[in-house]
Amino acid sequence: MTAPGVLPRQAIRQLVSQGHVAADGGIPDGNIQPASLDLRIGDIAYRLRCSFLPGSRRVRDKLREYQMGELDLTRGAVLEQNRPYLIPLREGLRLPPEIRARANPRSSTGRLDVFTRVVTDYGQHFDEVPRGYEGELFLEVVPRSFTIKVRSGFTLNQLRFVTGTPRLDDRGLVEAHRIRPIVFPGSKVDPGERAWVSDGLFLSVDLSGQGRKFVGYRAKRSSALLDLERQASYEVDDFWERVQPNSAGRLILEPEEFYLLVSRERVRIPPNLAAEMAAYDPTSGELRTHYAGFFDPGFGDVGPDDAPGTHAVLEVRAHDVSFALEHGQRLCKLTFETMSAAPDVAYGSGLGSRYQRQYLALGRQFKADRGAQLEKGSELLLFGEQPMEIESLEDASNGQAERPLELTTRDHLGE
């Protein structure tokens, strides 16, 4: 019997070999990540008049009521902005009775403001696959900021397999951090500053820029087509504008605009844990943070020659009204689960983990951002296609990069 927890890479491979996860033509081994499986879109996209959940019916039965047409994805097809599509995935499931699954967009998908969620037969919730599920998987896709082109076989989201109840409570998280530090300061911190824990680990936004003239990106309202299969092909300025705080040090988020920002803290996920960016807390502001939620074991474990941890890039959208952000404001939360076993290969270990050393990295489709240069003496650093490792700059870390932050639970917040 599988130990309780998130299933690691070797256990996912076993699910595939036993036929619990299957696809015509097999499943590429490269799609199996340390704690998740990349799912591939199929050959047809159905254009919908609205989103839906099947409830007491199969997806294909209810699809007939909402379908407005079909697109052939075998040669590539264009998906329009703000139009929902439903795409059958190549992978199907026949899960053992003790295993359930949960889906999230891939990092590269979320950074393009492409909203995705998995739908199952008889499903009452998006992105949740019940224990012992047998059947097809479908992906709802809604491009928000850009018109995109996709082709069958492309991967837009991931599936994480879980047994038992592996969620770490606050005490467990504090203890895990004591054994192997999880969060580190990404910039100068005040003496005694702590990272806060309350049903997960809070992360705050970095509006310092750490030596650059801007602190993030805002998606442009562009009619240009973005082919997701192309790499390092598009100019940043055609799709993004750089944003910076106002004279008071605040960044004003405009309603329904999409922003890429970065966490002030650096995060390192131990090999025995998996993390997920939790849904936004509406009491913290009308914000949606982080479409792409999975952080695999080994994320931020950049090696002995670098400062530990990696910044989390935050995908943020304000709703209804403008919203003011300040440097260091808590913006999102990481929740943690135990692994059923450590993965045989960790994130960043030859698996094409593009964002392991990121500061503020755009998707792989974009060229290096030559408008985002950081100059230190005669040394010129770029970020974009090759994310910067600014943690190594002495004036960015103030010599404190190696010291983990102390964690404090909500009990000590006086709330």
Question: Which residue ranges define each predicted feature?
Answer:
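DUTPase catalytic domain/fold
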Residues: M1-E415
